[in-house]
Swiss-Prot record:
Pfam families: ATP-sulfurylase, PUA_2. InterPro entries: ATP-Sase_PUA-like_dom, PUA-like_sf, Rossmann-like_a/b/a_fold, SO4_adenylyltransferase_pro, Sulfurylase_cat_dom, Sulphate_adenylyltransferase. This is Sulfate adenylyltransferase. Residues 303-322 are annotated as: Disordered. The gene is sat. It comes from Riftia pachyptila sulfur-oxidizing endosymbiont. Residues 303-314 have a biased composition (Low complexity). Belongs to the sulfate adenylyltransferase family. Pathway: Sulfur metabolism; hydrogen sulfide biosynthesis; sulfite from sulfate: step 1/3.
Length: 437
């Protein structure tokens, strides 16, 4: 099995030993404690689950290094992981504290931290980290606003994680740690594993994005990996996505070839930098290949200049742990009038691919009208109509017309999966450079 990033084995921070877990939970109730920001539980859950592997929340120097260069002061690769508080009045002079969950009633203890440093983060440092990650400091950007709405006091130190916030309780059939996914991959006997990141239900286009690389790579299986944290207004709620994806997988894929899972993290809408982070997660969970869309899922505002976006392939290849990654383009659809399977088998990318973006989901679902079969499988459409709240806006995309000039030349940009456009898709091979971590 492919090795985790920069290590021979995962380093989850969750306390798995039952006796130690009980002992630590009891101790935590007597420790000074702070209720952390709403972002904190997602980050601690990801560290506890083994999706990324810093020893805990970072000091400012390491967070700045991770934001600017994706490396820490010791040269290891990581993303920025900060615990930002409004103040430290509740901590006092304590060196060991309990971190409490703001997102669960009663604020249960998430983790225990051994404090190494308490530092003020300057406005300039916040601006640098914001710009490096999101490529904008516009407060209309949901990720920028969330990051900057936290306090300015960074508390750093190693942590021991005691629970996964609400994710495990609310999504018991879907939430999986990186450790659990690796174990399931081993149980299946898979050696070549394709991962697909999604914040949407899986429609015909998404289905084909999974099917084509599985066939061309002769992969053993695909792991559909859903975001279970916060999205933006208008995105489909996690329970609806879960039902739609499971139905699609059960009906339209061979048995024992699709693993439907989820993880407790928010969508950051951070463009190419988020692509690197998502690939990091997938390698740690055991995927050898990762399906990634052409355009970065970034938050568009009126004040962000419409300049060409950087190549996420370049971002990923320059990341220290992905220096020898590879990418191959795949066509998605030939003609909307053709069955997707026929289009895929035809192997031609000269068909009609003009996209039409239509905000008609609200009206169609409200009237009980299913989306076109070229867009969505009838079973998936029925679930969306049955379960999606009437007020939920759904963006439907289906395809007709001719390709744009130049699309046939396959200028592929590697970016975070989610904004999956029809003209191109890349499959990043994470196995070829695994020996370098």
């Amino acid at each position: 099995m492919i090795k985790p990033v920069g290590s021979d084995e995962l380093k989850p921070l969750f306390v798995y030993d039952p006796e130690e877990h009980h002992k630590l939970s009891h101790e935590a109730e007597s420790l000074p404690s702070v209720v952390i920001s709403s972002q904190g539980p997602r980050v601690s859950s990801m560290m506890g689950a083994g999706y990324f592997s810093p020893a805990g929340f970072m000091n400012v120097a390491d967070a700045m290094g991770a934001a600017e260069k994706m490396t820490l002061s010791d040269g290891s690769s990581s993303c920025s992981v900060l615990c930002l508080l409004e103040n430290t009045d509740a901590i006092g002079d304590a060196k060991r504290i309990a971190l409490r969950d703001p997102n669960v009633e009663g604020n249960p203890v998430l983790a225990v931290m051994d404090i190494e440093a308490i530092e003020e983060v300057s406005d300039e440092q916040m601006a640098v980290m914001t710009d490096k990650v999101y490529r904008t400091t516009d407060m209309d950007h949901i990720g920028v606003k969330t990051f900057n709405s936290q306090g300015r006091v960074a508390v750093s130190g190693p942590i021991q994680v005691l629970n996964f916030s609400y994710f495990q309780a609310d999504f018991p059939d879907t939430f999986r740690t990186a450790v659990e996914i690796r174990n399931e991959i081993k149980e299946h006997g898979w050696s070549k594993v394709v991962a697909f990141q999604t914040r949407n239900p899986m429609h015909r286009a998404h289905e084909e994005l999974c099917r084509m690389p599985m066939e061309s790579l002769d992969a053993d299986g695909v792991v559909v990996h859903m975001l279970l944290g916060k999205l933006k207004k208008g995105d489909i709620p996690a329970p609806v996505r879960d039902a739609a994806i499971r139905t699609m997988a059960e009906v339209y894929f061979p048995p024992n070839t699709v693993m439907v899972t989820g993880y407790g993290f928010d969508m950051l809408y951070a463009g190419p930098r988020e692509a690197v982070l998502h690939a990091y997660f997938r390698q740690n969970m055991g995927a050898t290949h990762f399906i990634i869309g052409r355009e970065p899922p970034a938050w568009v505002t009126t004040t962000v200049p419409s300049t060409p976006r950087p190549s996420s392939m370049t971002k990923c290849q320059r990341a220290p742990w992905r220096s020898r990654s590879s990418c191959r383009p795949h066509g998605l659809l030939q003609e909307a009038e053709q069955d997707c399977d026929d289009a895929r088998r035809a192997g031609s990318h000269q068909g009609r691919l003009r996209t039409a973006l239509r905000h008609q989901g609200r009206e169609m679902l409200g009237q009980g009208i299913a989306p076109p079969p070229e867009f969505s499988r009838p079973e998936v459409a029925k679930i969306l109509m049955d379960l999606l709240p009437v007020h939920q806006q759904l963006i439907l995309i289906w395809f007709s017309g001719k390709t744009r000039p130049g699309v046939g030349r396959w200028r592929v940009f590697l970016c975070a999966a989610g904004a999956l456009w029809p003209e191109a898709v890349a499959v990043a091979n994470m196995e070829k450079r695994s020996s370098t971590g």
